[in-house]
């Protein structure tokens, strides 16, 4: 028994040792398999396919920062700034960061922020709490640098600053309608700012950085340079623009008019040197400015040109041989289709010069009736009426031009003194620039161009020269535009007055007064159009309302540009047109 027991005990010990060895081997095998799996997984994630983890890490730490570029500067033809970008700051919040730091409290620093932004603390809290998990919300835009520095010193968690720019217009209301303005994101909304938005806008760059949990940049990954914006040099002369606006604004106030517009063009290049409207607005502070006050009336508003087309009627009659330079016309009132054609004052007869000087509707209508109906349509079109002005400005209109096949006699007659078509002030300025260049039609430009600008001849030079000389009589004693006369200079002008058309298409008891012309008449350099809309101070004729403005503006322009006086010296003989009938000074 004892021997058997002794043999069993070693056997059990051997089995127990074998069992422990087997479990140990199994455990080691499992550990090795786990290590192999972990090493394989690590190799897979770190070497074979690391993209997913890298992407996850980048999402948590990489940030793309925009490298902004300033909007291009707008200048006048001599480099004087008309629109510039000034550096400002945007204040923004990271709602998640604010909440992670304990949210908005009633502490002094949060109250200081609310006061600085002029936002009640409860409203500020509501805006940030509207999306607690959000990462971005603007609190204020275009904050001046001093205020931004103050907010930065508050060191509030989740409140950050971003660089941006704000547009500033040094000339303010003087160039408001032409230059326009931008919105808070520096996008052009009106005027040149909108029309040339792509040119003025640069391409922002990008900077990719790695940030730590506190938002600090710890590594620059890459960057893309921004592309600088283009500057824009306009054809405008800021000195002349200020002069035109000042005189126009004074005239609108003096005549209690609804509005006024004026356009000054360089005859030799077609460049627009000044373009003004009154009343204007302050583009640096648009608060309370109605949208209708922002339109550039020189390109958007149309009116019947009235007597300002009469020089073209005389040119056409001379070209077609209907009359000669020294012809005398019977200007006694007459009737057409039951309608009486008459002048403001009664004249028995007038020379061609007298027809322009006295602005005779009878005279030009008889010339028109002596020609085919297509004659005036063709001439007006040659000088640019009915054609787009193509400055590239938003809102430009081409006017309203008749496309008739058949014309009644009364339509032909009224067409000769500016009824039956509608033009913009800019279109009329182009007509007179063509007259001033003695029949050479040049495209208009709002940007600076380098001369020479050849243009296209649309009318014989000799005839246009003759009519320009006739137009000088309008500003001489006995003419309807004598109030436009400029001491020391000869000017060739035409005044006009037209009834306004109401919303229903009928004429109403309101008027538009205008004066258009060129100077100096001996060798024209500038063409100017002045339009006064609905004067209410008692006078409404162009000779009384717009002619004085023309004289004040053109006189200032000639002196500013150092144009040599060309008027006849005292003692030289000056030939005036003598007419039968009473004078009409100040009327037309």
Curated annotation (Swiss-Prot):
Substrates-to-products reaction catalysed: Preferential cleavage: (Ac)2-L-Lys-D-Ala-|-D-Ala. Also transpeptidation of peptidyl-alanyl moieties that are N-acyl substituents of D-alanine
Molecular function in Gene Ontology: penicillin binding; peptidoglycan glycosyltransferase activity; serine-type D-Ala-D-Ala carboxypeptidase activity
Record text on activity regulation: Inhibited by beta-lactam antibiotics such as penicillin, moenomycin, macarbomycin, furazlocillin and piperacillin. Antibiotics inhibit the activity by binding to the catalytic serine.
Annotated consequence of substituting residue 210 to C/H: Impairs recruitment of FtsN to the septal ring
UniProt-reported outcome of changing residue 57 to D: Impairs recruitment of FtsN to the septal ring
Keyword GTP-binding listed: no
Annotated propeptide span(s): 578-588
GO biological process: cell division; cell wall organization; division septum assembly; FtsZ-dependent cytokinesis; peptidoglycan biosynthetic process; proteolysis; regulation of cell shape; response to xenobiotic stimulus
Cytoplasmic side: 1-18
Active site: 307
Regions crossing the membrane: 19-39
Subcellular location: Cell inner membrane
Annotated membrane topology: Single-pass membrane protein
Keyword Protease: yes
Domain description: Contains an N-terminal membrane anchor-containing module, a central non-catalytic domain and a C-terminal penicillin-binding (PB) catalytic domain. The transmembrane region is essential for localization to the septal ring, interaction with FtsW and cell septation.
Its job: Essential cell division protein that catalyzes cross-linking of the peptidoglycan cell wall at the division septum. Required for localization of FtsN.
Protein name (database record): Peptidoglycan D,D-transpeptidase FtsI
Gene it is expressed from: ftsI
